[in-house]
Design a protein with these regions (language model features):
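Intrinsic disorder/low-complexity detector
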Residues: 13-14, 103, 227, 246
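Acidic, metal/ion-coordinating pockets
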Residues: 6
Length: 246
């Protein structure tokens, strides 16, 4: 099977030039909603798109608002610090920024799924459900309602169109960061309308790009565990939210 590039970011480390190799419209006529988290990956995704002249809108989802005791003990995905960082990056890039509340659908489709899995003695993967129901359903439809042409995220994955005319999901070039598995729930309707600008980059290069562009999150640590459990204590979370189910 032969492949043709979709609108995926291509980076030349020698000339520092970059381009999207396919688009039905020129960048300045193309609107992209960028899912921002306040982390380095989504921030660099936004920066690369802005540099190419795309009309970007930064959107951050308020997914969960569990609070713990002590300073800084909020869940990682929606902490005030993360919101502040995402807003700072958007201001630095000169793009609009919106924070939208999706707590109810997130609880129904992700948190309840997580609790149900543990109550049945299986290990759930809530990231798959989040991508299926929240990022690439709720947020993608939100982007479409805004009139955007694409939704971009900071996932380490790539897209290619085969000679069968279908969009195929490929691994990111950084095997240690590849996220194609958690995106495997996406169908053609979603893959046609999404972009993964950093999928062709190793993580170290993404951090270098962030530092070179002066993004305020360039040295921010990655979030490795479930974003909605602020202290990574599964037992405490399940006892708090699912005592009757356990």
């Amino acid at each position: 099977m032969s492949w043709s590039l979709l609108p995926t970011f291509v980076y030349n480390p020698f000339t520092m030039q970059s381009s999207f190799t396919h688009s039905s419209k020129p960048p300045h006529e193309t609107t992209v909603v960028v899912a921002m988290s306040g982390g380095v990956d989504s921030s660099v995704a936004a920066a690369l798109l802005v540099e190419q002249g795309y009309n970007c809108i930064g959107v951050m989802m308020r997914l969960w608002a569990e609070m713990g005791e002590g300073e800084g003990s909020t869940n990682k995905c929606c902490s005030l610090e993360s919101v502040h960082d995402a807003r700072r990056v958007a201001e630095e890039l000169g793009i609009p920024f919106y924070l939208i509340n999706v707590e109810e659908p997130f609880k129904q489709n992700v948190v309840d799924f997580f609790i149900d899995g543990y109550s049945r003695g299986v290990t759930p993967n809530p990231c798959l459900e989040c991508n299926r129901h929240i990022r690439f359903d709720y947020l993608l439809n939100y982007a479409r309602r805004l009139g955007a042409d694409y939704l971009a995220t900071g996932h380490y994955a790539r897209l290619r169109r085969g000679d069968d005319g279908k969009v195929h999901l490929l691994k990111g070039v950084d095997e240690n960061k590849d996220q194609s598995y958690v995106l495997s729930v996406l169908g053609q309707a979603e893959l046609e309308d999404v972009l993964f600008p950093i999928g062709d980059h190793p993580k170290a290069e993404v951090r270098r790009i962030a530092a070179e562009r002066g993004l305020p999150v360039a040295s921010k640590h990655d979030s490795m565990d479930l974003c909605f459990i602020f202290d990574d204590d599964y037992r405490r979370f399940l006892h708090t939210w699912a005592a009757d189910a356990m």
